[in-house]
Amino acid sequence: MSWLFTRNKEEEPTSKIDSSELQVPTEATASDILSGSEFDPAKLHPLADLDKPLDYLLIEEDALSTLPGDSMAIPSRGWQDDLCYGTGTSYLSGLAIGGLWGLNEGMKKTKDITSTRLRLNGILNGVTRRGPFVGNSLGVLALVYNGINSLIGYKRQKHGWENSVAAGALTGALYKSTRGLRAMAISSSLVATAAGIWTLAKRSFTKRLN
């Protein structure tokens, strides 16, 4: 029965590891990292590659508009430029004109007020009330006018004073379309007249430059 209490121990094979195969990790230096890659630290020098020609980023702008007829006051690449320039210029001009109007109005209304603070407050109220009103109104008119004018020029394939006057008439009528026929007719006439004057002034200015 001794075999119940004894076990045959199987000897497991042991493998000997050569100490030369063990590699102890060492800290890598900056030179080791740079030497093992394609990175050239000499290129970071401020005076590196001065003997080589410079590389320029060439960005070709879109061609200017070639529609025949009256040219724009400034070089234009199409209806996008006309829309942006016209709307922005009109808004800033209206803001300045409205600001002067409000300044004059505020000074007249507060001329009898002795308190400097109250008078300044009244003047600022007049400027902030009239300035944005005129600026927003002229900006909207210029936005619609340039859009309609560009559409007419695209359909006719040429610029001309007829385009400007027609665009001005349609813009004025559309701007006062909720006020009745009389208000639409008055607004249409005023904006068409302003567009005609602007076209004549632009033509004379362009002729002087040429």
Curated annotation (Swiss-Prot):
Designated name of the protein: Mitochondrial import inner membrane translocase subunit tim23
Q: Which UniProt keywords apply?
A: Membrane, Mitochondrion, Mitochondrion inner membrane, Protein transport, Translocation, Transmembrane, Transmembrane helix, Transport
In this chain, composition skew of type Basic and acidic residues spans 7-19
- Report the source organism: Schizosaccharomyces pombe (strain 972 / ATCC 24843) (Fission yeast)
MF annotations from Gene Ontology? protein transmembrane transporter activity
Role summary: Essential component of the TIM23 complex, a complex that mediates the translocation of transit peptide-containing proteins across the mitochondrial inner membrane.
Q: Where does this one sit in the cell?
A: Mitochondrion inner membrane
Q: Which family does it belong to?
A: Belongs to the Tim17/Tim22/Tim23 family.
Q: Where is this region: Disordered?
A: 1-24
PANTHER family xref list: SD19278P, TIM23
Residues annotated as transmembrane: 87-103, 133-153, 183-201
> Whom does it interact with, and what assembly results?
Component of the TIM23 complex, at least composed of tim23, tim17, tim50 and tim21. The complex interacts with the tim44 component of the PAM complex.
**So which domain of life are we looking at?**
Eukaryota
Main site of residence? mitochondrion
Q: Which GO terms describe its cellular component?
A: mitochondrion; TIM23 mitochondrial import inner membrane translocase complex
Q: Name its GO BP terms in alphabetical order.
A: intracellular protein transport; protein import into mitochondrial matrix
Its membrane topology: Multi-pass membrane protein
**Coiled-coil region:** none
